């Protein structure tokens, strides 16, 4: 249940909770910082292009960690790069989220077995909220992952830990295709 689902009384008053207002504002203006390290970055760039139009979801890419609330890690993270990933993560303001995109950032990809220099998943150095599988994942998969981050934000409550919010999200999974179709119908109607 979001802000727009709240009850409207007397056509002048909106009755809702502070959690709903704060979460609606945060999920409606998600500012990701892309950290593309390999071929997954090409798919991330394609997702930002006009074909997929992330701005219709309220997602506006940023290039500075100080302006971002979501880090998109895409590609092979090496041991030398790990320090920089941690530094960028620490520069992001709270609340901050991490989306790991592709096999390499999720688990080391095809390089994990024979590459001593490859990190076996970015979650070994920073906490990851959403994983997007694939090698490389299609833009539709990335949009689905971004929508999961938005659902995670929607379920947050003041005083509720992120772990509990993740459990709620696992109990009530979302269907990204249905939401994209709903967005298309709304755009056609207007």
Swiss-Prot record:
Subcellular locations according to the entry: Cell inner membrane
InterPro entries annotated for this entry?
NADH_UbQ_OxRdtase-like_20kDa, NADH_UQ_OxRdtase_20Kd_su
Question: Is 4Fe-4S there in the keyword field?
Answer: yes
**Family statement drawn from the similarity comment of this UniProt entry:** Belongs to the complex I 20 kDa subunit family.
How does the record describe its quaternary structure?
NDH-1 is composed of 14 different subunits. Subunits NuoB, C, D, E, F, and G constitute the peripheral sector of the complex.
Task: Sum up the protein's function in the record's words.
Answer: NDH-1 shuttles electrons from NADH, via FMN and iron-sulfur (Fe-S) centers, to quinones in the respiratory chain. The immediate electron acceptor for the enzyme in this species is believed to be a menaquinone. Couples the redox reaction to proton translocation (for every two electrons transferred, four hydrogen ions are translocated across the cytoplasmic membrane), and thus conserves the redox energy in a proton gradient.
| UniProt protein name | NADH-quinone oxidoreductase subunit B
Source species: Chlorobium chlorochromatii (strain CaD3)
Please name the taxonomic classification of the source. Answer: Bacteria, Pseudomonadati, Chlorobiota, Chlorobiia, Chlorobiales
